[in-house]
């Protein structure tokens, strides 16, 4: 309590000095039932009090101080207002409600009168005042209640007895007895309980000391976020300090109990209150897998300043050793920076029974089974966003991630950093400036490959861009210039031959005249693309051109008309679209087979995946090493159905095809091209099955072979509160190929997979979750897990049993029984004491569509 709150106690002295003169008899004098309203004098140390003859004369504000509905101000869900019910967190059966309500806009207590009420008041001279029977003192939103109260003017101390209750906004304290001192600015309560309404935290103690409006100290007490009647977990000890204003708690000689069972002791602890992040321990994540054994991580959050913090996570992996992970964040007016480092010294090599079986059978060697034994393994990551690109001026971007080896994430994962399902780790830095019409930038980029069967991309060291945009009298002009220096982390290709390196200048200049309206759009465009190279002579064939140049003019027109039909509650549109593209052929022979081993000049280019959206692109290649010739017309048709009431799209269907007016001649690697007169048929369908569910189909159909070459379909559903999620998808690709930088493609294979994932509540506290991902081509499971979540206001527990394909073992054996890892992942989060680990969250967010949004909703 602060000095302004202890002015409540001074009213007892005010009663004596304002009611009687100095010659008041020294013997006791009873005044009977007392109603007083007091205002501070100018010096704020003396009071003017006026007595009211009856309770009806009390000010309106007095009636707002109501007796609490129960000891903890806990209101069950059925008795909450509709607004409070909608804010009730999952698993909670009610919430702590401050009877004073929201005091955000209430007047300051210093500007409100002090109200005193008692059944009887007794004065002993001018030094002692006693209030007896239903003592109630209030000033604004602050109040004191007790059966009796005695104040000594000489010692400036007060004592209260019998059902003592003190309220501040968001804080309730009750005790059998209390003593207060205006000189020490302190109040203490015996055999007391307290509630922090907003943080959903309560506690009890042998004694509670209140040193400010928002700070209390528990002696011989405990705290919990569990609802009244439950002590599933509690944090208790010799001394616990709660600072509600800072959102932080500290404790000495603390024991964490689950029920009545102590599970952890620490001599000192700092912890956050609620889910806001303050310095202190976060709760651990524990998992076990075939590969690493038992894995336990205990994060510590360090709030160093309002604009920078760190999370330090010691981890112990039984099969590999002890490691440390550190995440740091920094924010100022110009930059946001995030960094991660992790280090595992002297890897023990892991423990994998499947690999040991292969070693015992003589299928692989010990070094193949445990290639990192004795090695130091590490991760480094830096991400930075700087400047203000949206408002013009300078901007910068850094996205750099590097690991010690390709198997780092497979073996170790990361408790505070996620790079799940990544083929590459980007290592990129960019600096740019936005002018009114131009954007200029310089960028350097490298990528670390995480998969063994992928080629390592070229490095860009550096890349310079200058892109201009102008609009003049309805015409739009784009001037795109790019200069890149390409080299390679390895000077030699896998076969030992020298890789092609060099520089490339590319330009793409365009002029368009777009016309748009409710009826549709039309966009004629002309342009010219050019390429120029300066190739390093090392490795080039004697007949190869070291400075090849290419150029091609192009023209296109894209147009669509929208026809609408309204009938009843539905509006239907028919949207035909026609796109014509012509680009002149330019000879690419100077880019093919320029080395003795037949390498082609191809730094960053691949064939785009064909889809409905690809129908209306101006190139079939991704990248800038090819100027593909084109003389083609694309015809597409889209129909949409909208609800006239809600405006939602209920149904959409699109179908389209490219008609080639001439054979294509430019290929990726100089190969003979398909000279068919039409492309495959592309179609997309999306159907809203209900307000919260949608079905989709995307397919590519080869009209010549009369077969589907690529298809994906699925249905997904989520409940209004996101407690239920359900996803089912199917994907098929015939003859899937991966492009190679040097010479063509890898071996073709089919992809034929189904993926089912879900989260469904069993009741208010229990939820079931799972995933089943199966590959029909290989006749094996890619990932399967089943788990449950228990979630109430007190704590959350998640347990997953997971089985997933180990790509490393799969490359060493044909035995499907040995190709999978299995693991159990466990996390517990004691609510009110900060966040939990990230491993289970990472698995669920990567595997179940909508889970990340579900988590975000649950924290609101």
UniProtKB/Swiss-Prot annotation:
Entry GO terms, CC: cell outer membrane; transporter complex
InterPro entries named among the record's database cross-references: LipoPS_assembly_LptD, LptD, LptD_C, OstA-like_N
Coiled-coil parts of chain: none
Subcellular location: Cell outer membrane
Keyword presence, Membrane: yes
Gene3D superfamilies in the cross-refs: Lipopolysaccharide (LPS) transport protein A like domain
GO biological process terms, semicolon-separated: Gram-negative-bacterium-type cell outer membrane assembly; lipopolysaccharide transport
Residues annotated as signal peptide: 1-21
Domain of life: Bacteria
Keyword set, alphabetical order: Cell outer membrane, Membrane, Signal
Quaternary structure note: Component of the lipopolysaccharide transport and assembly complex. Interacts with LptE and LptA.
Matches recorded under PANTHER family: LPS-ASSEMBLY PROTEIN, LPS-ASSEMBLY PROTEIN LPTD
Function in brief: Together with LptE, is involved in the assembly of lipopolysaccharide (LPS) at the surface of the outer membrane.
Similarity annotation: Belongs to the LptD family.
Name of the featured protein: LPS-assembly protein LptD
């Amino acid at each position: 309590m602060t000095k302004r709150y202890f002015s409540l106690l001074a009213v007892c002295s005010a009663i004596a000095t304002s009611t009687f003169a100095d010659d008041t008899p020294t013997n006791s004098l009873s005044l009977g039932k007392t109603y007083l309203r007091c205002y501070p004098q100018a010096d704020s140390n003396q009071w003017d009090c006026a007595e009211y003859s009856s309770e009806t004369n009390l000010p309106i504000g007095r009636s707002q101080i109501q007796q609490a509905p129960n000891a903890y101000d806990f209101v069950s869900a059925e008795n909450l207002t509709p607004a409070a019910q909608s804010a009730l967190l999952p698993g909670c059966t009610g919430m702590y409600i401050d009877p004073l309500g929201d005091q955000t806009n209430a007047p300051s207590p210093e500007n409100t009168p002090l109200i005193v009420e008692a059944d009887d008041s007794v004065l002993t001279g001018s030094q002692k005042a006693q209030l007896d029977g239903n003592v109630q003192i209030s000033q604004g939103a602050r109040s004191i209640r007790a059966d009796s109260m005695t104040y000594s003017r000489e010692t400036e101390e007060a004592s209260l007895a019998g059902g003592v209750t003190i309220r501040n906004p968001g804080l309730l304290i009750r005790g059998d007895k209390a003593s207060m001192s205006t000189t020490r600015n302190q109040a203490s309560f015996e055999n007391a309980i307290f509630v922090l309404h907003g943080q959903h935290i309560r506690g009890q103690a042998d004694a509670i000391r209140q040193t400010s409006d928002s700070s209390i100290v528990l002696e011989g007490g405990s705290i919990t976020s569990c609802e009244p009647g439950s002590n599933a977990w509690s944090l208790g000890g010799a001394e616990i300090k709660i600072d509600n204003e800072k959102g932080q708690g500290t404790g000495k000689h603390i024991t964490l109990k689950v029920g009545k069972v102590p599970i952890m002791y620490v001599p000192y602890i700092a912890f956050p209150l609620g889910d806001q992040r303050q310095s202190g321990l976060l709760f651990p994540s524990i998992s076990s897998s075939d590969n690493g054994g038992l894995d336990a991580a205990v994060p510590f959050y360090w709030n160093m300043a309002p604009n920078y913090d760190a999370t330090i996570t010691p981890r112990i992996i039984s099969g590999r050793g002890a490691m440390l992970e550190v995440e740091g964040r920094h924010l100022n007016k110009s930059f946001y920076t995030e960094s991660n480092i992790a280090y595992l010294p002297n890897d023990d090599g892991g423990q994998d029974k499947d690999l040991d079986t292969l070693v015992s059978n003589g299928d692989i060697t010990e070094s193949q089974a445990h290639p990192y034994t004795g090695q130091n393994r590490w991760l480094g990551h830096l991400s930075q966003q700087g400047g203000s690109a949206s408002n013009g001026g300078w901007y910068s971007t850094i996205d750099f991630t590097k690991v010690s080896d390709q198997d780092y994430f497979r073996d170790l994962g990361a408790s505070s950093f996620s790079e799940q399902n990544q083929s590459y780790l980007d290592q990129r830095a960019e600096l740019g400036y936005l002018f009114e019409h131009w954007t200029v930038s310089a960028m350097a980029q490298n990528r670390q490959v995480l998969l063994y069967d992928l080629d390592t991309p070229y490095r860009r060291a550096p890349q310079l861009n200058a892109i201009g945009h102008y609009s003049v009298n309805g015409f739009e002009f784009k001037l795109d210039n790019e200069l890149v220096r390409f080299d390679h982390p390895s000077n030699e290709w896998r076969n030992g031959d020298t890789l092609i390196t060099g520089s490339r200048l590319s330009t793409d200049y365009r002029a368009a005249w777009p016309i748009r309206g409710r009826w549709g759009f039309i966009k004629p465009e002309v342009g010219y693309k050019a390429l120029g190279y300066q190739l390093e002579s090392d490795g080039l064939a004697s007949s190869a051109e070291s400075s090849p140049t290419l150029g091609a003019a192009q023209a296109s027109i894209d147009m669509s008309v929208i026809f609408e039909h309204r009938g009843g509650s539905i509006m239907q549109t028919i949207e035909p679209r026609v796109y014509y593209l012509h680009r002149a052929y330019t000879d690419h022979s100077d880019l093919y087979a320029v080395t003795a081993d037949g390498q082609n000049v191809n730094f960053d280019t691949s064939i785009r995946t064909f889809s409905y959206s690809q129908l209306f692109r101006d190139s079939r290649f991704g990248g800038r090493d090819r100027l593909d010739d084109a003389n083609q017309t694309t015809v597409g048709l889209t129909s949409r159905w909208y609800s006239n009431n809600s405006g939602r799209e209920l149904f959409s269907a699109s179908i389209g095809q490219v008609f080639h007016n001439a054979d294509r001649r430019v290929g990726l690697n100089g190969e003979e091209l398909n000279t068919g007169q039409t492309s495959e048929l592309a179609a997309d369908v999306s159907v809203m099955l209900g307000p919260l569910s949608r079905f989709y189909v995307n397919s590519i159909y080869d009209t010549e072979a009369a077969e589907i070459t690529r298809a994906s379909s699925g249905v997904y559903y989520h409940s209004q509160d996101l407690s239920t999620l359900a996803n089912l998808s199917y994907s098929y690709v015939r003859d899937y190929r991966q492009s190679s930088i040097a010479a063509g493609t890898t071996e073709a294979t089919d992809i034929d997979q189904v993926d089912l994932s879900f989260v469904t509540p069993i009741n208010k506290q229990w939820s079931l979750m799972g995933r089943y991902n199966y590959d029909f081509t290989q006749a094996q499971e890619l990932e399967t897990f089943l788990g449950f979540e228990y979630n109430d206001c007190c704590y959350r527990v998640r347990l997953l049993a997971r089985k997933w394909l180990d790509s490393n073992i799969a490359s060493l054996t044909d035995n499907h029984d040995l190709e999978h890892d299995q693991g159990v992942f466990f996390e517990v989060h004691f609510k009110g004491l900060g966040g939990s680990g990230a491993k289970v969250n990472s698995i669920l967010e990567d595997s179940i569509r909508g889970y990340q949004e579900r988590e975000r909703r649950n924290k609101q």
